[in-house]
Amino acid sequence: MTNRLSESSTPPRWGMVVDVNRCVGCQTCTVACKHWNDTQPGVQWRSVIDVETGRYPNVERFFLVVGCQHCAVPPCVPVCPTGATQQRDDGLVTMNYDSCIGCAACAVACPYDARTIAHEHQWYYGTETLQEESARHPEREGVAQKCTFCVDKVDEATSRQLDPGVDFDVMPACAASCISNAISFGDFNNPTSNVSTLVHDQPTIRLNEDLGTDPQIKYLYSTPTVPGRDADADDLDEKHQSDPTNPLVGKRQNFWDWRATMNWCLGGLGSGLAVSAWIAYVIGQISMQATHQLQLIAGVMMLAGLFFVWLKLGRRWRAWRALWRPQTSWMSRELYAAGVFLISVLVTTQISQPVVGLYHLAGFAATCFLLCQARILHSAKGIPAWRTPRVPWLIVVSGLFEGVGLTLLLVSTNVVSNDGTFYLDPSKLAGVMVTLAVLNMILWLGYRYGADRAARPPLANRIVDNMSWPLLIVGHLAPVLLALAAWFHAADTSALLATAGFLVIAGGTFWKCGLILKASYQHGFTLSRLPQRGSGTRAAPSLVA
């Protein structure tokens, strides 16, 4: 046995080295992982993807071991609203299943598709067996789960003063079982460890290095006789990146469905209404009573959006735990903002004398809520269409645009009575409508054609392109024309403004649903260099010669 403490640094930095040229794609590591961790059908903590490209005889094939990368800068940790996803001092990113609520914030933040949420237990043969029942982990159902580098083995190694990179009985299951010695585990902080020696002597690559996550699985891709190569135009062309059969191309996320989307549709609309009403009140365009009426309606919509999110949670009765991490999680901050807003509105309802400060507090809280929604989506580092710089601006401006649209709809249809203090004249409302429509159009066109386009995968760009014309015509141009018609129309403009408001809301709902449900392709796997394991022009230079 090896004394780990005598050789490694303190604290260690555990990681893996995978030799792509050694991996034969036998899947022994995936089976060993499933056996040791007792994962149910459909749950893969460790996977081996088969990458085959080209056309005969110029073909190339290699195998890539993937899973949680235990990043030094893990994007999954700060987004977790409960603190269930944690990073230890030794670098391991672990899960506390008892704290997780199954919100999937970590899953969409992970750019390596490493997390799974199994809402119901599945059996390998369709019915329960004694062995599966004895190995069942009910604490993992409805919550996020992923590779832990067999943390139980690592901790056992520490307690027994062994080296999990050398001693097989405490080595992670995938590394211990690899038949070709392609997977090595060890301490990157120890310069004499097996993994440090491997990466010191040979060139390595890491998955999705451009994202700045500093993943701790490093891949050897080159040997003296079979040198690696740079990714070429064929690897990066749009056709290759749009091929759904390409295992390196990200699949559409299924963690956040229509229920989660309703939070952005209803919550964004409600908070936009509250912020718009607050601004109008501050500049003297609507009365205190009218402001309160609109805030009540906004509160109902925000609550409805949060209710749909609650329905999406894997562990709904733990939802209160989402208040635990306001220091890092925008989801936690969103709940606090909603709480402040709702309490302010309810207190205003109960007191006999209006308190101006409560109206301002509610308006400020609604603004924070809208900003939190923008940042929640932007923090999803695993979804390129969400993490681009214009997305937060789109969420905020669209929320205000929809809020003005809803105000027009409510007033024009007499849902909220117009006592003459809602606005000075129709021309001002039309001006606000046109201004926000133009600003939103500029942001959307920038999102579609600007630098954001290059940051999105081609499959997501197709969705964005298909959404653009309906969105611009129905959600922007038509409301602008109706608002301008109301501007110049001397007679009753209620029908024009109500229709314009409805179209604005419809447009906002359309693009949010499209962005969250349709354009939400995961990042996939990006390799800056690749091994040359092929034939014809794809063969290594030394073999061609």
Q: What is each residue range found by the language model?
A:
Residues 88-101, 166-170, 288-297, 328-336, ...:
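Membrane-interfacial loop-to-helix junctions in multi-pass inner-membrane proteins
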Residues 89-93, 123-126, 161, 166, ...:
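Iron-sulfur-associated redox domains of electron-transfer enzymes in respiratory
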